[in-house]
Amino acid sequence: MNYKWNYQPPTLQEREAARALSREIGISPILCKLLQERGIHSAAEAKRFFRPQLNDLHDPFLMNDMDVAVERLNLAMGRKERILVYGDYDVDGTTAVALVFKFLQQFYSNIDYYIPDRYNEGYGVSKKGVDYAYSTGVKLVIVLDCGIKAVEEISYAKEKGIDFIICDHHVPDEVLPPAAAILNAKRPDSTYPYEHLSGCGVGFKFMQAFAQNNGIEFHQLTPLLDLVAVSIASDIVPIMGENRILAYHGLRQLNANPSIGLKAIIDVCGLAEKEITMSDIVFKIGPRINASGRIQNGKEAVDLLIEKDFASALKKSNRINSYNETRKDLDKNMTEEANKIVDNLSDLSERRSIVIFNEDWHKGVIGIVASRLTEIYYRPAVVLTRTENLATGSARSVSGFDVYKAIEHCRDLLENFGGHTYAAGLSMKVENVPEFTRRFEEYVTNHILPEQTNATIQIDAQLDFRDITPKFFFDLKKFNPFGPENHKPVFATLNVYDYGTSKVVGRDQEHIKLELVDKSRTTS
C-alpha cells in the first residue's frame, strides 16, 4: 500500500507557544508542540501528564447510579445472597470479571462468575446465562463490558427475581434495560467527567466506590490495576484523562508485581526479562487472553487471571497459548480467502466499503480478518459468517469514520449490534445480507470523506538528526503509555541519504538496517 505523508508545519504562534512552554519546563520545543496538541499548555498540566497520580482519579460517586449500585451490592452481601459476576468473552470482559471477582472474593464467599459461550450464546447477556443464574440461586448479577442493550434478557431475569448491576461502556439505545443500576459514562444523562473508560475500567470504578463506602483502603485495589491496563490497551480506548492514570499505574504494577495469572502469560510470551509496554499488551498478552474466547471459552481466561498458584497458572497459560497458535493459523488462512474474494469483486474500485460473507469461516477470528481487510484496502470492512440461521460478524473502520453509525443506519435489518466508533459486532438473518451490503455501502459512500479513504502517515514534527539527543529521547519516553489520543509520534527528517551500508534484516527480511547522512552527521 502506498502511504501519503501528511504534515502541517506549526504556525508562528504555535512555535512561539511551544518555545514558551519549553522555557518553563525544560524540554525540547518539538516535544512541547506535541504536548500542546494533547491539550497541555502549562507546567502544571505537563506535570500531571508526565507523572499521573492516583489521587487525581475522579470520585466514582460522580457516575450516575453509583450510589444505588453500591447500596444494592451491600444489601446482597448483608442478606448473604448469591452473586454472579458476568462478562463478555473478550480481553476487556474477562479482565473485568477477574478484577471484580478477585476483589469481592476477599470479603464475600457466596460469589461465582460466568462468561457466555461465543458460539452457543453469542455476545452479551443471554437467556441461557440468566437461566444458569436462576438455577444456581443467584439474586444479583454484576454484568461487565456488556448489558447496556440487553432489555429483553434483563426483563426476563427480573421476572425470575434476579437484579442486575450493569457496568458497561458501549453506546446505549434510547431504552435502557430495567436494571437495579446502570453504570455507563456514555448514558445520555451522564454527569461523569470522563466517558472513555474501558469495561474493566468501569468495573474498577465500581469497586473503588464499594471500597470507599465500606472503609476499605485504596491500596487494596492497586494490585488490580494490571488488569485495567491490559483492558485499556486491548480495547483500544483513548489513553488520556482518567485512562492515562489507570494505564500508567497499571503498567507499573504489571512490570513490578503482576498477578499470578498475568505473570504466567508474561513468561509464555517471552517478556519476563523486559519492560512491558502497551504495545506488548496489544500484540502479545492481549491476543493470548482473547484466544481463549475465540477458540474455546472465555471462562478459561478468567480461570487463569484469578489463579493463585503459579504452576497451575503456567499450565493454563500454555493451554491458552496453544489456542493462540490455532487462532494464528485460522487468521492466516481466512485472510487469504477473504483477500481473494475482495480482489474478485467486479466493482471493487468504485466501492467505499467491503462486506463479505462466508458460511464456513470461524466465528472467533472474523474480527481479526475485518481488521486485516481495513488495513489492506483502507476502507470500512464487515466480515460475516453463519451461526445457525443468522449471519454474524464484525466491522472495523478507518481513521476518522464512525462505523458504528453506519451499522446503526441499517438497524432495521439487524437482530443485534453493538460496539464503538471503529469496531462493532452485528448479526442479521442470512437473507438480509445483500440488502445490508447495499445500504451499508450507500451510507459509507455518502458520509466518508475522501481523505479517510487514503492511507496516510501523519507526521507529527520535522527534526534534524542533531535534535535527537539522549535528553530528547529521555523526555520522549515520558509520553508513555502510548495509545489512542496519545499515539507514538512520527518524526520526519528531510534531505537525508543512504551512506551505502544498508541491509535487509529480520526473520522474514521485513526490516532494513541502514546508516543515513544528514548534513554530514551520521546515525545508524
Question: Where on the chain are the PLM-derived regions?
Answer:
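A common structural junction motif
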Residues: 411-415, 443-449
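Acidic-glycine-rich active-site phosphate/pyrophosphate-binding loop
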Residues: 75, 171-184, 516-521
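Short gly/pro/ser/thr-enriched loop/turn and capping motifs at secondary-structure boundaries
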Residues: 119-121, 150, 170-175, 189-191, ...
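Intrinsically disordered, low-complexity regulatory tails of plant transcription factors
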Residues: 150-151, 235
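Short alpha-helices
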Residues: 99, 177-216, 221-233
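Generic beta-sheet signal
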Residues: 114, 144, 167-169, 183-185, ...
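Hydrophobic helix-and-loop "lid/oligomerization" segment in the mid-to-C-terminal part
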Residues: 2, 10-140, 160-161, 211-435, ...
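Accessory interdomain/linker segments of ATP-dependent helicases and helicase-like nucleic-acid enzymes
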Residues: 459-523
